[in-house]
């Protein structure tokens, strides 16, 4: 099994992703394959990375892409169509994130999986089937750094240069940092406190007089 590097959650605006690509071939790879149901009992997501594709990896006895030493440190996942279908478990993108995946490129994605990825800072891009196949069949894909430019919607390496497709709303959220709800709330702490203090029922809670704010 590949050693997983120390987890660092993405925060704030994201404009580029640079890293090696890892290829996972197959249509309709569902969330139960990404993270089997028995791992959903966890109280947090911290250790899900080591269990990603657990059953598939066991069946392939060390030959699964997520077990190959050549894919160590990879952060851009290349998939086929309807990736992330099945149940809506948010554990699936969380497991990928904690393994080290920071972006996914594929033919298509299940809608709920796509939204769950966006919510934790994993941008998902689409490409036509032919171009995805070209990337997946490139024997040098594991040996060179690739760069995704979210603003320009491009995917570049020493071997190819493709224009990616991403929803404009998703693109804007990554570039502005609005995908990161926690950081957005923390950055606007004073505005939130002011809004709370302006609410009549919060003033009521601060007073012993029942009708003070009326």
For the regions a protein language model found, what residue spans apply to each?
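Fe-S-dependent hydro-lyases/dehydratases of central metabolism
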Residues: 1-214
């Amino acid at each position: 099994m590949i050693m997983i590097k120390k987890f660092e959650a993405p925060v704030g605006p994201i404009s580029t992703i640079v890293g090696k690509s890892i290829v996972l071939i197959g249509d309709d790879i569902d969330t139960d394959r990404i993270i089997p149901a028995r791992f959903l009992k966890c109280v947090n997501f911290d250790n899900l990375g080591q269990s990603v594709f657990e059953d598939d990896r066991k069946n392939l006895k060390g030959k699964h892409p997520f077990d190959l030493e050549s894919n160590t440190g990879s952060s851009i996942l290349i998939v086929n169509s309807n990736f992330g279908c099945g149940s809506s478990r948010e554990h699936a993108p969380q497991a990928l994130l904690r393994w080290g995946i920071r972006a996914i490129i594929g033919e298509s994605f299940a809608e709920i999986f796509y939204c769950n990825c966006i919510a934790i800072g994993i941008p998902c891009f689409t490409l036509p089937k032919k171009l995805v196949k070209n990337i997946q069949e490139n024997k040098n894909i594991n040996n060179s750094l690739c760069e995704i430019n979210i603003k320009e919607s491009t995917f570049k390496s020493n071997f190819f240069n493709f224009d990616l497709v991403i929803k404009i709303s998703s693109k804007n959220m990554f570039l502005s940092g609005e995908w990161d709800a926690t950081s957005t709330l923390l950055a606007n702490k004073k505005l939130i406190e002011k809004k709370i203090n302006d609410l009549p029922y919060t003033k009521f809670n601060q007073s012993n007089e029942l009708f003070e704010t009326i």
